[in-house]
Amino acid sequence: EAKGPVSTVYFGGGTPSLFDLSQLELLVSRCLAAGTHPSEITLEANPEDITDERLKAWLAMGITRLSIGVQTFDDDRLRWMNRAHSGQQAIDAILSAHALGFQHLSADLIYGLPDRKTPFAEDLEKACDLPVDHLSAYILTVEDQTVLGRNVQKGLESVATESLVEAEYAL
């Protein structure tokens, strides 16, 4: 039971959009039944998980904001990150969500990507041209225990230079 008013609920941590719709609806309804009446309920989603059916269901259950893991609109860098979506799919997901009634959309971007064909500034411009009201930018973090981390250690992959990361952060 909630000890005080909860103004926002955030379903994050990766890909909660992969929840079966009935599971997610149960989570949302339990939040609401606990006496909370949040002004905002956010769901993180990857572009490839966004369909009209899911968008309509999320709206019906009370999701008010989508935080979409765009990462970049650069297809080459998306492939490098082993992402399942393309830059165009990210754009289409945002436009579909807006067209179906989501008033609050967030796009997550990553800066500090090595060997970009398009500058991070172009990702920012594209995101700002879309109907999003929030942008989050995260630096690429290379963890030793990941495939990328091991490949960097072996010299098979490069990382962005410190000056590039600083310049992109300054944007």
Protein language model annotation of sequence segments:
Residues 1-171:
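C-terminal scaffold of the Radical SAM
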